[in-house]
Amino acid sequence: MTYLQESSRPAITVPKLQAMREAGEKIAMLTCYDASFAALLDRAGTDVLLIGDSLGNVLQGHTTTLPVSLDDIAYHTACVARVQPRALVVADLPFGTYGTPAEAFAHSVALMRAGAQMVKLEGGEWLADTIRFLVERSVPVCAHLGLTPQSVHAFGGFKVQGRTEAGAAQLLRDARAIEDAGAQLVVLEAVPTLVAAEVTHMLKIPTIGIGAGLDCSGQVLVLHDMLGIFPGKRPRFVKDFMQGQPSIQAAVEAYVSAVKECTFPGPEHSF
């Protein structure tokens, strides 16, 4: 048995994401952690596969992403990359792995050797030097602003960011700083719709929203969440795409279509 993908569709690359943004084509991203789902998500037309530290929640059972290790991310990145998907493969740098530019580079190299084509790290202005250091060394970077789960204890919980005038101004400064440093993509999580729209219109790089409204260049959800596999209360920004669908692939195709056609997220999924 092989999960190697044979697709006539061109591969999604970092320049392709930029071209999609400029053409007004929405980008559909989902988290992915193994070969089986990598093949399925790729067939369904997902543009970006994110090996997220959310695996600490949905696979390992932790209440936060903080216990996830670099080895964990590298292992799951290799599982996804072996499929050779058309989708771009992005891997999270876990908590505590990018305290200095040199440390971030060494750990990014490990993830890229495992098959990542881009790394994601959480933070704004304070990370500009690190982002620049990585980009200068041919490591494509996705930044993550707003509700950054690795900062859950600093935030005092999972809270919407950028609601105050000062908070929104800082988010705009962060966005400008990471773009100026060379980031090629940015995730905006749990950010008020109007603020996310302002960031999206200000930047030249694509923005990927999760609980950040419809104006972003694309959307991302945790795979398990969009399939309705979550314990307890469903997060506001999540829609269960499995409802009414005959298969997981049909559910993923429905998600991709909803993102591309701008029918997701709705106001009920935004702040």
From Swiss-Prot:
The record's section on CDD domains has:
KPHMT-like
> Where is the protein found, in the record's own terms?
Cytoplasm
Catalytic residues, per the record, are 189
- In terms of superkingdom, the source organism counts as Bacteria
Q: Which cofactor does it need?
A: Mg(2+)
- Which family is annotated? Belongs to the PanB family.
Catalyzed chemical reaction(s): 3-methyl-2-oxobutanoate + (6R)-5,10-methylene-5,6,7,8-tetrahydrofolate + H2O = 2-dehydropantoate + (6S)-5,6,7,8-tetrahydrofolate
The gene name reads: panB
Q: Name one GO biological process term.
A: pantothenate biosynthetic process
Keywords for the protein's UniProt record, in alphabetical order: Cytoplasm, Magnesium, Metal-binding, Pantothenate biosynthesis, Transferase
Gene Ontology terms, MF aspect: 3-methyl-2-oxobutanoate hydroxymethyltransferase activity; magnesium ion binding
One Gene Ontology cellular component term attached to this UniProt record is: cytoplasm
- Which residues are recorded as binding 3-methyl-2-oxobutanoate? 53-54, 92, 120
Indicate where this protein is primarily found: cytoplasm
State its role: Catalyzes the reversible reaction in which hydroxymethyl group from 5,10-methylenetetrahydrofolate is transferred onto alpha-ketoisovalerate to form ketopantoate.
What EC number(s) are associated with this protein in UniProt? 2.1.2.11
Quaternary arrangement and interactors, per the entry? Homodecamer; pentamer of dimers.
Q: Which Gene3D superfamilies match?
A: Phosphoenolpyruvate-binding domains
Q: How is the cofactor bound?
A: Binds 1 Mg(2+) ion per subunit.
This protein is called 3-methyl-2-oxobutanoate hydroxymethyltransferase
The protein's annotated pathway: Cofactor biosynthesis; (R)-pantothenate biosynthesis; (R)-pantoate from 3-methyl-2-oxobutanoate: step 1/2
Residues at which Mg(2+) binds: 53, 92, 122
